[in-house]
Amino acid sequence: MTWLYQDTPIETLPEECVGFVYLITNNLSGRKYIGKKLAKFSKTTYKTVKQKNGTKKRKKIRSKIDSDWREYYGSSPELTADVITLGTENFTREILYYCKSKSECSYIEAREQFTRKVLESRDYYNGHIQVRVHGSHIIDKI
């Protein structure tokens, strides 16, 4: 099952997209899950460089690699068990928001979870809400 954004199947994410907030729906029971996913992960590798004076120095090389967002079905153990048991064809994955920063992703995910009252109902797989975002990362950026 592919991701949908505004009812359109998505194969690639926009260039400026750092991550996205999503909704996964169990089509059989109606239960839902709100989460966030980063588009790329940072990968650090080390390279040994020989300097002019003959000494060796380790150089950090940082790069971005694609995350597993295409195959991702959330971090909830209960949701993951249902996906394995019922099959991916019984779930709908929707992208609600594209985010331009990690902070924006965290904030919008928590805002959606509080707005939908995910902890107050068994209609959601979400078991906890965890967020820590500084206001300066959000004000005037959303």
Model-derived regions: residue spans:
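Structure-specific nucleic-acid interaction/processing domains
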Residues: 1-142
